[in-house]
Amino acid sequence: MANLRKTHPLIKIMNDALVDLPAPSNISVWWNFGSLLGLCLITQILTGLFLAMHYTSDISTAFSSVAHICRDVNYGWLIRNLHANGASFFFICMYLHVARGLYYGSYAYKETWNIGVILLLLVMMTAFVGYVLPWGQMSFWGATVITNLLSAVPYVGDALVQWIWGGFSVDNATLTRFFAFHFILPFIVAAAVILHLLFLHETGSNNPMGLNSDTDKVYFHPYFSYKDILGFIVMLLALITLALFSPNLLGDPENFTPANPLVTPPHIKPEWYFLFAYAILRSIPNKLGGVLALLFSILVLMIVPILHTSKMQTLTFRPFSQFLFWVLVADMLILTWIGGMPVELPFIIIGQIASILYFTLFLLLIPMAGLMENKMLSLK
């Protein structure tokens, strides 16, 4: 009798993706982040589901309902802390996953890469609307500031902002629709993840050498299934440690104050994982220019495959491009730091220099380094 695992229409799909999948034998720990992101998504959907059972999306009760979850619901404090800090881990894994893609030239698989960039945007949207739900000071003012950016759109800007708000300011209608968006978006993300995997399995995984690995493949199970489980254990341990020992480390103290439209916090800033983009937004004195720079800071990833000039796929054997990659990493960290600082000297100028460098690296320096390395390869 034929093996059910290989013949059943549904189980066969799972088998081809998780058991008999041919994987390059040399993929390193940097290839663990895809499965870790899957784990993050499942964790967030489950904890979010239990939070949604007790949360009320009304401005008069939203803040109290979050307090009620933490005080009165069985293990509500744990579910809430896991959900809030799970978002941080989601973004850490996502940024590392993107960095891996940039370093090892995984953007050569254009469909997989572009769906990945769309996924990044979807998750950022989900996190933004989710941050508004507790209805604390930073929730309210963050929502006000970021949604207000849409007023920079020529001609239709003001109408667009009022349409999203459902009125003339961030109010009850805004909170209700943001809760609806926050509930539906993770399922759209899950659908996009399936597409992401579908396109990935058309080509197979890249590997650290950037060479064709058809001659040296191993089964996904048991080799990489166990490797992924090790990653799961490490990440869950880190997440649980953060959620139990220092759950508010990455949050903003302002959000412990209920939203008040009459009192503006001294420093309005988003969660830490958006600070680099926020720094780019703030470094341009013009509103529309800032919004475009903010958008392009993520969308620039879409044109990375077009700007690939090197004869080699990965940076493994390209020291100049490697140096520029690490400059980009340092630049992102500087932008993250600047995004959390007040708008005053010397932070303004540092942010502007870091923003210019960010785009120059992507659009000019890294492609030029690729051309230079090609030249050096052809030297006799």
Curated annotation (Swiss-Prot):
Enumerate the subcellular locations listed in this protein's record, separating them with semicolons.
Mitochondrion inner membrane
Recall the GO molecular function terms of this protein's record: metal ion binding; ubiquinol-cytochrome-c reductase activity
Its GO CC terms are: mitochondrial inner membrane; respiratory chain complex III
Q: Name one GO biological process term.
A: mitochondrial electron transport, ubiquinol to cytochrome c
At which positions is heme b b562 bound? 83, 182
Bilayer topology reads: Multi-pass membrane protein
| TM spans (from-to) | 33-53, 77-98, 113-133, 178-198, 226-246, 288-308, 320-340, 347-367
Q: Which residues bind a ubiquinone?
A: 201
Essential cofactor(s):
heme b
Q: Major location, coarse class?
A: mitochondrion
PROSITE patterns, per database record: CYTB_CTER, CYTB_NTER
Tell me which Pfam families the record gives.
Cytochrom_B_C (PF00032), Cytochrome_B (PF00033)
Q: Where does heme b b566 bind?
A: 97, 196
Cofactor binding: number and manner:
Binds 2 heme b groups non-covalently.
Q: What does this protein do?
A: Component of the ubiquinol-cytochrome c reductase complex (complex III or cytochrome b-c1 complex) that is part of the mitochondrial respiratory chain. The b-c1 complex mediates electron transfer from ubiquinol to cytochrome c. Contributes to the generation of a proton gradient across the mitochondrial membrane that is then used for ATP synthesis.
Q: Which family does it belong to?
A: Belongs to the cytochrome b family.
Give additional notes from the record: Heme 1 (or BL or b562) is low-potential and absorbs at about 562 nm, and heme 2 (or BH or b566) is high-potential and absorbs at about 566 nm.
Subunit structure, as described in the record: The cytochrome bc1 complex contains 3 respiratory subunits (MT-CYB, CYC1 and UQCRFS1), 2 core proteins (UQCRC1 and UQCRC2) and probably 6 low-molecular weight proteins.
Q: Write down what this protein is called.
A: Cytochrome b
Q: Whose protein is this, by species?
A: Arapaima gigas (Arapaima)
